[in-house]
Amino acid sequence: MDEDCEVTQLQEQSCWATLPDVCLRRVFWWLGDRDRSRAALVCRKWNQIMYSADLWRYRTITFSGRPSRVHASEFESALWYIKKFGRYLEHLEIKFLNPYNAVLTKKFQVTMRGLLSCLGKSNNRLRSLSIQHLELDRLVWRNSIRGSLIKSLSFFLKKMGKHLDHLSLKGARLTVEQGCHILNSLSYMQNENMASELNIEDFFSHHLAVYGSSQFNKAMATFRNLTFLTLNYNCISDELLETLSENNAGTLRTMNIKCHVHDPHGQVVWGMSWAKLARQASNLKVNFFFERVMKYERLARILLQEIPVRSISLRSCYFSDPDWSMRPTLTDLLPTFRNTLQKLTFEFNNNHESLDEQLHLLILACRKLFYFKIWAFLDVKFVERILKSQEEGQCSLHTLKVRIYTNRYETNEEDRTLREIYRKYRKLIDSELNYFVVAYPMM
């Protein structure tokens, strides 16, 4: 019996020992760091697999912003990883979640200094870097700590900028001078940089009129290969659009523009500047995201008819203004983009006015619209009207998401009606739509 067991064990060992490298790498790919380390101790071959480049190309490093024993070692382990496997990295994402105090921001800054220094020395593969939501304008970031972090990041980008294809510094919240210093670091080794994706949404602090900065326009002039550009509307100017027309006309495909109520957005941007950019960059599509910028007069200054608008998101959260009306925007402004609009997202408190008819007509007018999401005060029958239009071929939605606000705690009646509507159009919904509809008490 013992001999049979030994034979079986030898067979099992030989089976694993002769497993092809491609299969072993696939097994390792599914393992977490701790299990990979344990597996690497099995034999020399498995240890060699541990150092396969394709296991370490993508990495997300998360630092907790709260003091905790559980997360105490994450700063040290991040450095250990970069020293051990950093040379294989191609895509790196770093997260620092809601720092609690200056002690933790200092610890993060010191860790980042070592991490970026090591990465700059050992890596020549990095294509994508994302460091989001640092919010460096918060009080937990003392001036010296903030300055040291910016210095380390700038030095790293000076060395690695020529390799980077994608850079996201969303939510950094810098001054204009600090932000432009970092952007200029990308082109330090040459007079231009070839990054194709740049995300600088909330890169600058609130209340800054970046559109008037010559520093910013000069920094953006170094980009010659942009395909995707994400930024705030307080960065948009005729000069920036002119720069994009001259330097990125052959590549620029998507612009994502966020306009927040606290960001300056009263600047004059001429339609001819947008028209020139749209003409030069013929494949350009622009997506707008408005947060608490809802009044028609403001929107009309921004949403010029010359812009090739693909998507519009209008969100006011739960703020209610009885002097505000959404109707002119739905009937006069948005239909201007009927030939290009593909996505519409609404979230507003319209308790003081009914908009069912205007919303329905807008959907019918935008023949390319495939995504429609709305959270608002609506009649339940609004959903049925949309489904009927879809069935009759008057619209071609792929996604329909509706949250129907009500002024009652109980939504039993609305829920029952929605179930009846679903049963009536179930075949259509199941075959054509990503469908989510719910009644929601708004008290």
From Swiss-Prot:
Check the record and name the PROSITE patterns matching this protein.
FBOX
Gene3D superfamilies in the record? 1.20.1280.50, Ribonuclease Inhibitor
One Pfam family hit = F-box-like
CDD domains in the record, alphabetically? F-box_FBXO39
Alphabetical list of SUPFAM superfamilies matching this protein: F-box domain, RNI-like
Keywords, comma-separated and alphabetical: Ubl conjugation pathway
Q: Which domain of life is it from?
A: Eukaryota
Q: Which residues form the F-box domain?
A: 13-59
Q: What does this protein do?
A: Substrate-recognition component of the SCF (SKP1-CUL1-F-box protein)-type E3 ubiquitin ligase complex.
The record describes its quaternary structure and partners as: Directly interacts with SKP1 and CUL1.
The entry's protein name is F-box only protein 39
